[in-house]
Amino acid sequence: MDFAGRVVCRDVFEYPYPDPRTLFPALESKLARVNQALGANASKVVGVGVAAPLWLGGWRDFLGAPPDALDAWHEIDLRSRIATMTGLPVEFAKDTTAACAAELVMGQGRGIHNFLYLFVGTFIGGGLVIDGRLHGGPHDNAGAVGSIPLRDGGARKPARQLLHAASGFVLERLLSDAGKPAAAAHDHRALSPEMWRHTEEWLDTACPAIANALTSAAALLDLEAVVIDGELDRQMVREIIRRTERVLDRFEWEGMVRPQLLEGAIGADARAMGGAILPLYAHFAPVHELFLKPATEAAY
């Protein structure tokens, strides 16, 4: 991404779970292709931004990954590994915090100054903006909405945390169990008549769970808005907002200010674009700590 926020080059590597034995060779290969595509402009690259979960070795039961693949992350310094690979400075942020940074700089954040950000990817996660600044907190984990405990899991079965009810992987499994392609959870096919029954089953659990989490957040944070985005079809994002608003209509708001729900402006690439912002702010922003993780390393 260039200084004006334009995406210069884009590539994708899909994997069922983050296995460093396959991820790093693929990443090295793709970075080499990017450098080749940039040609003479490769020398102008100021750094690499990494947007990744803080705990890459977690939630193995849901990813279906072998223990040895995820355990390896506990011994890996991701920032150092990529710096060695590229020879460039590396900046790091939690993936959904990076997505929130993109929304703050290039999306709804240009008009609102206090908002909670939700991103529905494989897992649901988020970020937090207070007084126009990205707020990470002492552990750089503010806005970890996926870990909010739930009072109940909606219509079907109990869920321990919001991520068990409202994450994309839940819809992926519903589709897969029905003999449908799991990847359809993240595009227009999820809204097709053929798959709508499974999508609606997910929405019936996800939206009440999101609404419950948002009431707690609104009471604690006094928000202007909640911005919802995801690695989803845009109509699906709007359907989540519509159904969540319907649930919120039934809640008692006395003593609280109900935040407006807004559709994110960036979309599926928010995490990657937020990551790409990080080196630019490290070099050019007057107070780049507002956007970047401190030097202390995350636990993978």
Describe the role of every protein-language-model region:
Residues F3, K44-R160, G274, L278-E297:
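Phosphate-binding/catalytic loop of phosphoryl-transfer enzymes
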Residues M1-K44, T84-T86, D152-Y300:
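ATP-binding/phosphotransfer module of carbohydrate and carboxylate kinases, centering on a glycine-rich
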